[in-house]
Amino acid sequence: MRGTSIREGAPKTLLARALYDNHADCSDELAFSRGDILTIVEQNVPESEGWWRCLLHGRQGLAPANRLQVLRETPADRPCPLLPRGPDTDLTSSGAPYQVQDLISPPPQGPVYEPMRSWVEGPSPATAQVYELPESPSSARIICEKTLSFPKQALSVLPRPTRASLPTLPSQVYDVPVQRQGFSTLERLEKQQFYDIPTSSQKALLHSSTSQGRDVTLAPTMAFRQGGGYNPLSSPQKSERIHDTPVLLEKADVRNVSMTSFTKDSGSRAIPGSSAVHTGAVALSPQLGNTVQRKNSLPEEPTYAFPTSRDPLPSDAGGSYKVPSRFLIPRVEQQNTMPNIYDTPKAMQGVSHNAPKAMQGVSLAGKELERGREAPENSPWISGQTSFLSPDSDRLSVASSDSRASVVSSCSSISMDSSSGSSSEDSVKELWMDVDFAKETAVSLQHKVASSAAGLLLFVSRTWRFKDSLETNIHRIRRAADHVEESVREFLDFAQGVGGTACNLTDSYLQARIRDQLQTISSSYQTLLDAKGSLDRCNWSLEVLVTDKVQNSLDDLERFVATARIVPEDVKRFTSIVIANGKLLFKQNCEKGEMDLKCERCIRPPQRETESYQESSPFDRQPTTEHSFELARKNRVNVCWQQSPNLQEKGKPTMEGKSNRNPDFHGMSPPPLTSPSPSGQNTERKIHLSKHSRLYFGALFKAISVFASSLSNGQPPEVFITQSKLVITVGQKLVDTLCSETQEKDERNEILCGSSHLCGLLKDLALATKSAVIQYPSPSALSLLQSEVERLEHHSRKFRDTLE
């Protein structure tokens, strides 16, 4: 709309559209935004070439001409009405009346402007050639700016869609075509038929009257909001004039339709107004023909009502209930030709149905849920149900479907988390053995890995891949590779058990070391498995393995040999970690062994009864594995009892008191302990110490005495740090000498037990020395260091007396 002059002969006002935003740099410049319509007041501004004087929203100023586009007037332009009229006044003109052009279809040929409101609006009487103006609150005002000479703005009032009245001129209005459902009978309706849309109160009366007396076919009606928008008619190029159903209103209000007529009369079928491809779903009954004839003959308005988005169909007695995969989309079930599709409410979720196929492959949790709900599958309460959905239950089913989808996803995630958690728990193994047995196991498995790798490397030479050499040794190489794989697997199982035991430690540094070394061994074992698997698949074929020249890249056999060459070093490093930290790793095992032994002592029968039971027992001969496991448990108990002699001393007076109170026990010797005390062992047999061991014991005692004297004399940290290092070094040499010289198993267990305790005291001494140096001259730190020195000296002398 352009702001032109309203008087004939007046100069035309030029309008321009802003192409870009403009910000005023001075007071004379006019600021505007892109898309604004400016009124050009003067194009030739003196001393301002390229600038126009323009007007925008009552503000006048200079605007750059290169940012404006002049709007040219076209012949189709018409002047705006001068003054707004009231709703009751008529506007007469000698010429043709003002008409609103329709974008979809040409305007009607009649002399009167007939606007379409909502669906159809009746025209004004033919004799009164007036332009109907609605009330000002519901009108849309379009304001056109005028020049400064016309300060008042002209208002053009356009009508908004209002509720239509009954038509009086059928030949001069749009006719609304009947919605096509594929029935030939509906095509015989009158071409010019008008539909009135009743209000919500009228609709309630219509539904009640329909359900009580009349046999009227239900056709779609919808509760439109007053003042709501509408979709235009379908394009006139279509061969069949089918009125398009408003999409937004259909989705919003389709659930508000009453279901009274559906539940009362099951004999009459509703014409589904929302689906145009409902093939074969509803047959044309005789009632429909009568109803259509009644529509054409009766002067009454035809009544139409929408069915709900889900047609309630009677369920079979043995029909299976399936949850549709796309139940959230409105009217999906009407487009589906399969019967018996029901949504499952939330409350029935605990009862089993035939689960949909899309749900069966979601996750393992879905299968577990299915198996858990198989018992009440054929419940008569479900199979005998005949449901008629109400709008409330329909909305509830949609809400329950959302919650059901979220519940299924959460159940699957929970079950996957629990399964992964259980698998991780199963993978973590802990070794319940004493320190000595763990060290022996680690050393023996390490020797096995080293010997098997050495046996394989015996065949590796400069010419071992030649045909003659490989043909001779191929079977031996294969057996050696099997031994390497088996030995590494056994050590890896033991290492994983140590890693599980290390999870109970508080030393994060030790846990990280064990975890990293275990990961290295696991990677090497996986490489061995992959290479050996490839060799087994080719059956160790000579044609594949024989080569007479140097290879640039490693094949499977070379990769296996290279990995077997480095595995013993990784295994040795892990074994050293276990030996050095065995007391920390398996300390809790000894404590549990002490508690188990304490319980055994309380309930152990006399020795004679035990011997007689063993003689009469038919299970005297046990497998070798059970015997070895029992022997390992006894060794653990022995070591733990040696480490806790005070537990023995506490148990002796208890047994003596019981024997004194009960005279029947006087003729019976008390049950012997599992192992005698170290002093008792010394009376029977002494361990012969070598010359080197004796020298190291003497050096240790001397270093400890010098260290203690320096502490008592108040020497500076530079002095007692050196003496502390000397004590620790001599102690480590002593432990290494004792462990290497002792070969017998019983003596070795005893020496390893005392040596591990000695190593622990040496570690405590190192920590106390570090603390004393940092806090020097703190008396508390020095006193703690002196107490550690005294403990070390006491245990060393006791250990020496125990051995010899």
From Swiss-Prot:
Give me the ranges of the annotated region Disordered: 369-395, 607-628, 642-686
Q: Name one GO cellular component term.
A: cytoplasm
Q: Where is the composition biased (Polar residues)?
A: 380-390
Does the record's keyword annotation contain Cytoplasm?
yes
Q: Which Pfam families match?
A: CAS_C (PF12026), Serine_rich (PF08824), SH3_9 (PF14604)
Which is a GO BP term held by this UniProt record? positive regulation of phosphatidylinositol 3-kinase/protein kinase B signal transduction
The superkingdom of the source organism is Eukaryota
What's the chief localization of this chain? cytoplasm
Domain (SH3) spans 11-73
Q: Name one GO molecular function term.
A: protein tyrosine kinase binding
- Where would you find this protein in the cell? Cytoplasm, Cytoskeleton; Cell junction, Focal adhesion
In this chain, composition skew of type Basic and acidic residues spans: 649-664
**What's the subunit arrangement here?**
Interacts (via SH3 domain) with PTK2/FAK1 (via C-terminus).
Similarity-based family: Belongs to the CAS family.
PANTHER family attached here?
CAS SCAFFOLDING PROTEIN, CAS SCAFFOLDING PROTEIN FAMILY MEMBER 4
Described by its record, this protein's role is as follows: Docking protein that plays a role in tyrosine kinase-based signaling related to cell adhesion and cell spreading. Regulates PTK2/FAK1 activity, focal adhesion integrity, and cell spreading.
Q: Any idea what this protein is called?
A: Cas scaffolding protein family member 4
Query: Which lineage?
Result: Eukaryota, Metazoa, Chordata, Craniata, Vertebrata
